[in-house]
């Protein structure tokens, strides 16, 4: 994997609060190598380690995107949801930002069936067929469509398992992470000081609660994916 320069600036990360971890009582001892200090009852993340692993993650997604690989971004907590959708749309990735439905990847055949149903209902809505149904039947199908849009809207164009999954908040998305581990899908995960750095293929130590921190990390990854996609388009 070729190393590239991604303009990852320590001062920019400090301004975004990337270095603020959780309280010292809520920590995973495995995170000790990624912590530089304790301050006012919270752990301070070593930003040089953050920069190193973020750079590695950018290299990985660039190379994958330049080979036409598919990405899934997962972040369902309220603070991350809008950022995840925005980042995924910009980078033309799939995303889950409302709720992870158990078995979404490990029981892919069921997910695929739901996606087919979702696409069929969207087609019926666009062509006006729903309006021609009896009111009660139309109401039932509209509720189904709304439910599917909420939970599967970000993966509606996904035709198979993703090649790489990017996870925002390891604790919140533990089920998704476990499904990736089971299937052998490479993962990139934001990890705060209460997480296990050994679970993901690339763990980026960072504040996973602050919107500014999540935005900065996603911005770098999105830029790398977009650059990789441009390379793929130029050299198919």
UniProtKB/Swiss-Prot annotation:
The keyword Zinc does not apply. Keywords: Chloroplast, Plastid, Ribonucleoprotein, Ribosomal protein. GO terms for cellular component: chloroplast; mitochondrial small ribosomal subunit. GO terms for molecular function: structural constituent of ribosome. The keyword Translocase does not apply. GO terms for biological process: translation. It holds the Pfam family Ribosomal_S2. Its main location: plastid. It is found in: Plastid, Chloroplast. PANTHER family: 30S RIBOSOMAL PROTEIN S2 PROKARYOTIC AND ORGANELLAR, SMALL RIBOSOMAL SUBUNIT PROTEIN US2M. This is Small ribosomal subunit protein uS2c. It comes from Daucus carota. The gene is rps2.
């Amino acid at each position: 994997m070729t190393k590239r320069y991604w303009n990852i600036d320590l001062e920019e990360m400090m301004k975004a609060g990337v270095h603020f971890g959780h309280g010292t009582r809520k920590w995973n001892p495995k995170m000790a190598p990624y912590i530089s200090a304790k301050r006012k009852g919270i752990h301070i993340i070593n930003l040089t380690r953050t920069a190193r692993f973020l750079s590695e993650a950018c290299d990985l997604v660039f190379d994958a995107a330049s080979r036409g690989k598919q990405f899934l971004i997962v972040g369902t907590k309220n603070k991350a949801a809008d950022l995840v959708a925005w980042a995924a749309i910009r980078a033309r990735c799939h995303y889950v930002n409302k709720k992870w439905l158990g078995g979404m990847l490990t029981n892919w055949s069921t997910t695929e069936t739901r996606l087919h149903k979702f696409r069929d209902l969207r087609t019926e809505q666009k062509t006006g067929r729903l309006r021609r149904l009896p009111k009660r039947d139309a109401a039932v199908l509209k509720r189904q469509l709304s439910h599917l849009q909420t939970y599967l809207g970000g993966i509606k164009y996904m035709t198979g398992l993703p090649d790489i999954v990017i996870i925002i908040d390891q604790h919140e998305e533990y089920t998704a992470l476990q499904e990736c581990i089971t299937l052998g899908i490479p993962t990139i995960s934001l990890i705060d000081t209460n997480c296990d750095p050994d679970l993901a293929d690339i763990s980026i130590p960072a504040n996973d609660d602050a919107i500014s921190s999540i935005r900065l990390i996603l911005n770098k990854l999105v830029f790398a994916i977009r650059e990789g996609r441009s390379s793929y388009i130029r050299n198919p």
